[in-house]
């Protein structure tokens, strides 16, 4: 059974490992395989979570099965008065767990947080060829607003 919860700070290393696994499992996350390990640390991630999520600015939820973190969704709220009503979304689900409704549940829970926190615009970036993600986003009400050519180079 999948359980959805806030990330407990004592699970930060498990979350770090999930992020690194997602980086190697798919070509569609921002980091190249092993790039995250070279550019940041578990401690930096912990500070980010403490400063932004635990303080209530951002949303972060994980999905677990048998105590293993299998996916997450994060919404990073705008930091200025003019964009404080927006949040940028990142979602990652291990390949084995895709197509099981985890993404839809994440978005339903995110919508509740957004309404409670006066977020009126949720946004994200997806590669044109990532049809699985595009279908999930469109199913959850997202619309394509434009194409950013040459914004990412995937090796």
Residue ranges, per PLM feature:
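Conserved short alpha-helix immediately C-terminal to the canonical SAM/SAH-binding motif I
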Residues: 106, 130-133
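A short beta-loop-alpha structural element at the N-terminal edge
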Residues: 3-17
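Helix-loop element at the rim of GNAT/NAT acetyltransferase active sites that forms part
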Residues: 6, 18-35
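Conserved catalytic-core motifs of GNAT/GCN5-like acyltransferases
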Residues: 123-127, 138-155
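Conserved acetyl-CoA pyrophosphate-binding loop and the N-cap/start of the following alpha-helix
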Residues: 97, 101-109
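Active-site acidic-Proline motif in GNAT/NAT acetyltransferases
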Residues: 91-96, 100, 128-129
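Conserved GNAT acetyl-CoA-binding A-motif
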Residues: 107, 114-125
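Acetyl-CoA-dependent GNAT
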Residues: 9-10, 23, 36-95, 107
